[in-house]
Amino acid sequence: MQLNYEKIMKEGLTVLSSGTTGKPKKIYRSPKQLIISFQYSLAGQKINKDSRVLTVTKLTHAGGSLLQTLPAMHIGVPVKIVTFNPYKFLDQVKDYTHTFLPPAHMRAITKTKSWDTCDLSGLRIVGGSDKVSWDLIEAYVSKGAIVQPNWGMSEVGPFCINAEYGSKTKIDKHKKHQWILGDNFSVEWEIVDGQLFVSGEQCVYNGWFATGDLVFEDNGVLYYKGRK
């Protein structure tokens, strides 16, 4: 599947939610809403004219289309879209600066023969669609990558809460609890009875949105506990 950027920017885009807040839903984003979310995604991931994006995830979901692919197209950044293959990925990504990987993809890559000798310096990997474990973050940072575990939803925006790791020092600072949500925020947030509520211009709904995620804060950092 490819994306028709010109058509999308005229008509908007419908993506499928992951189903974490109930049955998977079709979420429509207008051209205006897309541009707003692009601005957050570009700034938060440091995607600029010198970047190159490799997309290996489904374009029907926000992670595949809204997180990096369309924002990069919006500013004329080269984008290559391929089907994920863990055995080919490390060769494919050598010429790119940004990619998005769910944790299952990240783990599959570490099990290939090429993993032990790979050098991921200059690559920024945003992880999401599921919880990203500390061992995966550490593994990719040890290979030279910048790793950004990211929390977002089709309903509230693809790039909302995340952390950025490029060294063991910051990992050790945050690794006091099991599942990181982040300390960088592109939405307003509050915790009510343990549940995360978010609001902001990326959201397709007005007012506060109940995410269904149970979280807690520790010194300005949000951590994930489970689902409501």
Give the positions of each predicted feature:
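Gly/Ser/Thr-rich phosphate-binding loop
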Residues: 98-101, 110-173
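Conserved pre-ATP/AMP-binding loop-to-beta segment of ANL
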Residues: 2-16, 46-52
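Conserved adenylation A10 loop of the ANL superfamily
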Residues: 11-27, 228
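Active-site glycine-centered loops adjacent to acidic/histidine catalytic or metal-binding residues
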Residues: 20, 129, 152, 213, ...
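Conserved ATP-binding/catalytic segment of the ANL
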Residues: 190, 195-228
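AMP-binding/adenylate-forming
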Residues: 25-48, 52-110, 148
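Alpha-helix/helix-capping structural signal
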Residues: 32, 104, 130-131, 202
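Short beta-strand-to-turn element immediately C-terminal to the catalytic PLP-Schiff-base lysine
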Residues: 28-30, 159-164, 192
